[in-house]
Amino acid sequence: MFEETAAFSLFGLTGYWYGAFVAWGAALFLLFFARYCRMEKCKNGTAALFSALCIPLGLLCSRVLFCLLDFRFHGMFSLRAAAMFWGGGFSMVGALLGAALAAWITARIQKIPALPLLDILMAALPFFICAARMGEGFTELLGRSRPLNTAWLANSFLAQNDGYDAYLRTYLLESLTAGILAIFFAARIQKRKTAQGSLLLGMLLLGTTQALFESLRFDSHMRYSFISMQQILFACMFAAALILYAARCGKKQVIIAIAVCALVAGGAVGLEFMIDRSSVSSLLLYAAYILLLALPAGLGLYYKKRSKTP
């Protein structure tokens, strides 16, 4: 990772821009988490306790999930190699799970319900994702697509050229989407004066968009053949949100939601295979992908509105 990441020098010490953006994102996330805690009138010390737990648990879970699901790492797996986290190798989903675990532990210690903290967590998380994904622009390998074969896209600002091929800057799209979600949740909380309902809504929106972006990524990060392991985890995220929304509308809707999830899973595998192995235009395939993922997103929003819940 060191050879592939842009560095800077400060007071005689070497720093890395990617790490700086991750740290900036973490700081923004914790600041907004504290702000939303104040708006929700959480118990004194809740935000401080969460902050103390979140960073170590986020790093730990991110590293552990990477070590478990990155198949290239398995060939050199050892406890010593797993502990050498400073050389790179982290999972975004693992970081989110670590933050959720920190929120749950905080709720247990403070003897308060966990759900309000998880709502606050989901509303603040896009700030971290936005900055962390932007930081990938200072690496050579993270956050880029397969080689582009569409001239107008290859010559746009969304493309990165390495002298041989042009690649889509997927990290830019992810950062922009996370930024939009951060603003959306901030405006939503400001209007409603509560973060209630943010958890499921965030799982639905973040899960569907990240499932698409993980498909666009082709950086060998946590992949098995043409399938991204993180894509599967993000798909589980939006599927869980969809089914929970459906449960509020009756058992019949749960069956429909499960059927839709199965349909989307089958369609996604088929599209992934075609993207990886066929000569069909990637633009057409990704247009179909967007329509496919719009199905659970739209259905989830419909169930949310129908159930008249936050």
Residue ranges and their predicted role:
Residues 1-310:
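A feature for loop-to-transmembrane-helix boundaries and adjacent hydrophobic helices
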